[in-house]
Curated annotation (Swiss-Prot):
Residue ranges occupied by any PPIase FKBP-type domain in the UniProt entry: 171-256
Listed Gene3D superfamilies: 3.10.50.40, Trigger factor ribosome-binding domain, Trigger factor, C-terminal domain
Pfam families, per database record: FKBP_C, Trigger_C, Trigger_N
Location(s), subcellular: Cytoplasm
Record keywords: Cell cycle, Cell division, Chaperone, Cytoplasm, Isomerase, Rotamase
PROSITE patterns for the chain: FKBP_PPIASE
Name used for this protein in its record: Trigger factor
Free-text domain note: Consists of 3 domains; the N-terminus binds the ribosome, the middle domain has PPIase activity, while the C-terminus has intrinsic chaperone activity on its own.
Gene Ontology annotations of biological process type: 'de novo' cotranslational protein folding; cell division; chaperone-mediated protein folding; protein transport; protein unfolding
EC class name: isomerase
EC number: 5.2.1.8
Keyword Chaperone: yes
């Protein structure tokens, strides 16, 4: 076998490999000998079929299998010997001229093919013991608890019909009938009757509720939306749809009195018990916000201390995912780049920078996890699936079946678990100090696109 490196340019490498016909023929013959004991051919006793006869019948298909296996084995050997870690799948280019292909399959000509790869760069990890990370912590006040209870009361408020001819406004509950289509064709789950939609609740597809503002009872509108790219149903994810929607009733919200009686409607003994419950719930939210702040600060530190050229193909892939999402969101909302005080070119440049950061951080976290033998167990993934199912009451079986039959979706659940375990590992080594902050500071809306 002859291996010639024809390109070595940064992270890109290409090789031309030539495998002698005799080597391929010997491997194919070995497969045919093994096949002799497995096939049944009329006129021959089991195991007594001559290899030459088998070659006439199965020669080409066995040689094709042999070539495929040889290419995979050879590529693996080449990459391993050079210490390459692949960023993407190898791109193999085979002979295409029919006469040459026939000779190779007949074992009469050497196999010459090329393979192009992009590799992961060598990464020198920083000393995490030198990292200083601030941990913002906020106290929960009585006012925070009262505000949370008010939000709960608003969510459980009753509604009363609006006057005849009144139009729907934000906060109103609109009862609708709708029929959804994609490219003019109805789809499963796209039809509903007597469905209550609270405008501004953000419980429906982005853009659906906003387009109900101003609708009157009996009025029909065509609502144009785009399903999120991470929508549970893969067949609908990222697709534009139209919903012919008719309002059959419009109701305005009524204020709810917060007292012991309100608490009892929620299954609690008193308002004091409700306050205890809300304080515990807020404690969880504050803890999660602190975690996100610490994680963001740590990722920023990793970004600062690990500057290297990431594989272009991985950056392109990450950029395309984000850009497709941006375009779908803009199409759904009807916004333009001018509305965001930018241009398409500037936006692309910004998102490509974010894509580069994400890819580099992903490679760094992977390197840390690999070197420190950090893994995600099947039990941890199962617990994540269960939590996801619990978050969608009434659809638990659908969620469970979706992940059980979709390895890619399961991998998407595994990735953040792995990332969090690596982050925890680094935080154990870093110098983490608490800092008291206000609730507003803890929950301030930072631009998190790059995280």
């Amino acid at each position: 076998m002859q291996v010639t490196e024809t390109l070595s340019e940064g992270l890109k490498h290409e090789f031309q490999i030539s495998v002698p016909a005799a080597d391929l023929d010997a491997k194919a013959d070995a497969k045919l000998v093994d096949l002799k004991d497995k096939v049944r051919i009329n006129g021959f006793r089991p195991g007594k079929v001559p290899v030459a006869h088998l070659k006439k019948i199965y020669g080409k298909s066995v040689m094709a299998e042999t070539i495929d296996q040889t290419i995979r084995d050879t590529n693996t050997q080449i990459f391993t010997e050079r210490g390459f870690r692949l960023a993407t799948e190898p791109k193999v280019t085979m002979p295409t001229e029919e006469a040459e292909v026939e000779k190779i399959l007949a074992g009469q000509s050497d196999l010459t093919y090329s393979v192009a790869i992009e590799v992961v760069p060598a990464i020198t990890l920083a000393d995490f013991k030198t990292f200083a990370v601030e941990k913002p912590v906020a106290d929960i006040t009585d006012a925070d608890v009262d505000e949370a209870i008010k939000r709960l009361a608003d969510a459980n408020r009753s509604y009363a019909a609006k006057a005849e001819g009144a139009k729907a406004a934000s906060g109103d509950r609109v009862k609708v009938n709708f029929k959804g289509t994609i490219d003019g064709v109805a789809f499963d789950g796209g039809t509903g009757e007597g469905i209550d939609v609270v405008i501004g609740s953000n419980t429906f597809i982005p853009g659906f509720e906003d387009q109900l503002v101003g609708i009157a009872v009996g009025e029909t509108r065509t609502l144009k939306v785009t399903f999120p790219t991470n929508y549970l149903n893969n067949e609908l994810a990222g697709k534009a749809a139209e919903f012919e929607t008719t309002a059959t009733a419009i109701e305005a919200p009524e204020d709810k009195v917060v007292d012991d009686e309100f608490a009892k409607t929620l299954g609690l003994e008193s308002l004091d018990k409700l306050k205890e419950l809300m304080r515990d719930r807020l404690a969880g939210e504050f803890t999660q916000a602190t975690r996100q702040r610490v994680k963001r600060a740590l990722l920023d530190r990793l970004d600062e201390t690990h500057k290297f050229d990431a594989p272009p193909s991985l950056i392109d892939e990450e950029f395309n995912l984000m850009w497709n999402s941006v375009q779908a969101e803009m199409k759904s909302s009807g916004k333009t780049f001018a509305d965001e005080n930018t241009t398409e070119d500037k936006a692309k440049e910004e998102y490509r920078t974010i894509a580069d950061r994400r890819v580099r951080l992903g490679l760094v976290l992977s390197e840390i996890g690999e070197k420190n033998k950090i893994t995600v167990t099947d039990d941890e993934v199962s617990r994540a699936v269960i939590e996801r199912a619990r978050s969608m009451p009434g659809r638990e079986k659908e969620v469970w079946d979706f992940y059980r039959s979709n390895p890619q979706a399961l991998a998407q659940l595994r990735a953040p678990i792995y990332e969090d375990k690596v982050v925890d590992f680094i935080l154990e080594l870093a110098n983490v100090t608490e800092k008291k902050v206000s609730k507003d500071e803890l929950f301030k809306d930072d631009d998190d696109k790059a995280a």
